[in-house]
Amino acid sequence: MYKLLLATNDQAVRDAFSAVAWENLGFKQPRMAATVEEALASLKAFHADAIAIALPEAEDALLIKRLMAAYPDLPVMDAPDKRGEVELRALELRKLLVRLNADISNDSYTLSDQMMVVRHEYFRAMMDRRIPTGKDIVRMLRLVRSKRDPTRPCVVAELKMPASSDFLRGRWHYGPQRLEMALRNMFGFEVAGLRILSCVLPGERIILLGCPMRGHEMELAENSMTGVVSEPVQECISHVYEFLGIDLSIAAMHVLPALTAMAADEAR
């Protein structure tokens, strides 16, 4: 069974967690800590597969910062004060933990490797607008310990290839996966405080996302973001053509006010 630590001094949250039949959800009864220091001491003394946090804003920020330094791959679950909501979040967490512990490769994957794979799956879902709301995106990024800031402006670019290209339709076995891995290697750079992420989505859509990282100051004004990002993207497009023979071009590029604008309800 999975082990969960609850960090909160809110009695309503504690009561909600105490009311859950945790064994039925695949968890042991959660350990509880009331402060940042108690939570860190518990993590040091006892194994935990995840932590649920409901602390005042300043304490929450401090605990997240300390976790990033010492436990960067420990999933962080929201801690609601209603039993039904706790159960929903626990099921979401269990799904993540199952993926983190799955045998997905013949290679020796570490927890960090597994989390990176799962994190990319979450980002692909977000870029495909399959995450229902902005609140879900914020919760998701916290759960998978992403360093990307969901509250600040980001750049989205859509690439296209010639209609005659058959790279994604049969020229190569696993064409989309092969192309996405190549793009992740070539576009995995940072420019002016923006980290670039690439995904190949259904419908032969190739999407690049440039977003700021938590704790890093933005070097760009919102109205200049596309101009600064365009040049390194064009350079990477040249490398893609050189190594894979794929003639990509930028079909569209625009700035979103935040990652939360990629939620499904924002597209309606």
Predicted regions and their residues:
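A short helix-to-beta-strand connector/capping loop
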Residues: 26-28, 136, 246
